[in-house]
Design a protein with these regions (language model features):
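C-terminal regulatory/interaction regions
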Residues: 236-280
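Active-site HxH/HxHxD metal-binding segment of metal-dependent hydrolases
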Residues: 38-135
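Short catalytic-loop micro-motif centered on adjacent basic/acidic residues
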Residues: 30-33, 57-60, 146
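Conserved beta-strand hairpin/beta-sheet module of binuclear metal-dependent hydrolase folds
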Residues: 1-51, 156-167
């Protein structure tokens, strides 16, 4: 595990979820998306210790535990760290049991709770809710940008080095080619956010999930691939609904026609995205 420099004071640490690190002049740091709880946060902290970096702030781009789950472990290690998120996604971070209810579409069950719930997620508290716009931390300015779609409260962080951390607005090309029926809450907002990203001035983009840092030029190609994936499923679902179908039959067709991997958890994620498409 390494601290990889993107530009200036902006770094990231690769992982299943990439973690952004912005280092201030006093060698304290802002962490963007600490990732899942477990062994990885301990390794991240070891890397930071080796570089004499003390974490002072955490910003979570959205309320999914693969991005915010390690907050408590960072809080235990760095006692005075300030944990932040959007106001909307604060609800899900502080009440992780709501996510399984949302995914199931009603009262959840023990099986789903056991898949999604982790004891290390208990009692995460958001110290400060943040809004879109200029945002000052430790005498330096950041841009907080709303990118709704994946969740209602998704945000991105743009550093003064012109590096943007977009959470799950985009995923890496290597992942998108395998899993193109993405987990989305609001299709129209996702389209709006993808178009919005095209007009933002940045030099480098760090994905929540993906192996490479993306240049501004390459981001256009990746944005179009995401838009095309959306169009693909919108077209398929419209075609399938020429004749009335139940939600279950429609979902079965989508899974089978696209050879989507399917287990209990993925089934409910696909169903949630399908409902979002139908709403759109």
């Amino acid at each position: 595990m390494n601290l990889t420099k993107v530009k200036g004071n902006t770094f990231f640490i690769k992982g299943g979820t990439n973690t952004g690190i912005y280092v201030f002049e006093d060698n304290t740091a802002l962490v963007i998306d600490p990732g899942l709880c477990g062994s990885r946060p301990r390794r991240v902290n070891k890397v930071l210790d080796e570089n004499n970096i003390q974490v002072r702030y955490i910003i979570n781009t959205h309320g999914h535990d693969d991005h915010y789950g390690a907050c408590n472990q960072f809080k235990e290690y760095y006692k005075d760290v300030c944990i932040m998120s959007s106001e909307y996604d604060k609800l899900y971070i502080e009440n992780p049991e709501l996510f399984s209810k949302y995914i199931v579409g009603g009262k959840s069950n023990v099986f789903m709770d056991n898949i999604l719930k982790n004891k290390m997620l208990d009692d995460i508290k958001i110290d400060k809710s943040i809004e879109a716009g200029k945002f000052e931390l430790n005498n330096e300015m950041f841009d907080i940008i709303e990118f709704q779609g994946h969740t209602p409260g998704s945000i991105a962080v743009l550093t003064k080095d012109n590096v943007i951390f977009v959470g799950d607005l985009l995923i890496g090309d290597e992942i998108l080619s395998k899993y193109d029926f993405l987990f989305l809450y609001d299709i129209q907002e996702q389209i709006n956010s993808l178009e919005k990203l095209k007009n933002i001035d940045f030099e480098y983009l760090v994905l929540g999930h993906g192996k490479q840092v993306i240049s501004k030029e390459d981001s256009y190609k990746l944005i179009e691939k995401h838009l095309n994936a959306l169009k693909k499923y919108l077209y398929q679902i419209r075609e399938l609904l020429v004749e009335p179908k139940s939600l279950e039959i429609l979902l079965k067709n989508i899974i089978n026609n696209n050879n989507l991997s399917n287990n209990y958890k993925e089934y409910h994620f696909f169903k949630s995205s399908l409902v979002s498409v139908i709403s759109y």
